[in-house]
Structures are given as C-alpha cells and as structure tokens.
C-alpha cells in the first residue's frame, strides 16, 4: 500500500509539500456540492485571528466590513449563549442581498440558527394573518415579531447587540378596513429589525402557501437551504 508523503527533507530542513488549508477548503466545497456539509465552529477555526479583537462578533464584523470572507463557508457557525441556552448561528448566506433594497445593503452575512430556540411562540394569537389599522404588513404586527423584539432580543449578549445589523425587506401587505383578506394585495419596504425569521421563499426557493408575487417580494433562496432539507429541518434546542 502506498503511503502519503507530506514532508520532504532538503538541505537538512524538513519542509511541507502539501497545502493543508487548500486541501481542507476543497473538502468543504466537495461536501457543500453534495449537500452534506454541517459547518465548523468559526470561534475554534479562527481562534488566533479572533484573539486580536475584543470578541468573535467584533472579529466577524471587521471581516464583513472588509468583504474578507476567506475561509468562511455557508454552514459555518458562531455559538451564542442566550438565556443560558447555546444557539449555533450558522452562515446562511454571504452578501446575499448586497446592493439591493430601497436603501442599498452593504456587505453582510446573514446568520440563521442551526436549531430552534427551546422556548416556543405562536405566530399570531388569533386565526388571522392580516395587518391592522396601524400597519398593513401582517408580519410587522404579528405576535412573533413582538416576541423577537421584546423578549428574544433581550437574551442576546451585548457583544452581539453591538455588531448586529437590521434587515430590510420588501414585505407583503394584507389589510382592508372592510374585513379580513385571504390574499395579499401589495407590498412595501420595511425594516425587520435585528432579529427576524426567513421568508417562505428564502427557505424553499418558491412561494407555496403565500400570495404569488406579493409574498415573494425581492427574496432569494439562502444557499444553506438550497436543494436539501438538511438545514430546513431544525430540532428543539441545540442539537435537538
């Protein structure tokens, strides 16, 4: 059986003859192509680089501002402790919405939790998916968004709050003072805030239950969800 040669001695000095980083990167790309890549903990992978910053989120923010994504792949993650619960925030897409929206988006990484938070929340407390007189956007007046803004955001460590950016999106409108509607009728730009849930189109790459056109907005499917259910299916709690 042939053995693998990794070093050779020349002039009395042992030298590497293979590029470990390139080999590992090629392996990751191969796993991504086959939709089996489960991601790496970026805090571990880039520990020496992160040590030059106050924390891992200051580091990733600096990387994003410089548009330096070398060695960072869709599926990689940064752990966050929220209300004593560990949540692995995965890279869902890199510059997915760069230079889009009515207020052009700069360089960014969108993170989505690998699994669900154990605390559950009902999207709406009534069987009604409409906006109201204060806002025609169903999501913006939903019980879910209220919980994200007023409860879950409070669980974030300050080091995350200091770096997190808001997401802007073209959202569907569904409201009439005459009564409840079953389909959306228009759209408009909205600030989703620091925490949000992906749109149907961002997960499935198509509108299945929403209103064609209005529900899609300017959404694109995040790479992490493309052509596989590996990241679409999430457990209750870390590793659930």
Task: Name every feature range the model reports, one short phrase each.
Residues 1-31:
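Short, low-complexity N-terminal tether/leader segments at secretion or assembly junctions of large
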Residues 30-240:
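Collagenous Gly-X-Y triple-helix signature in extracellular proteins
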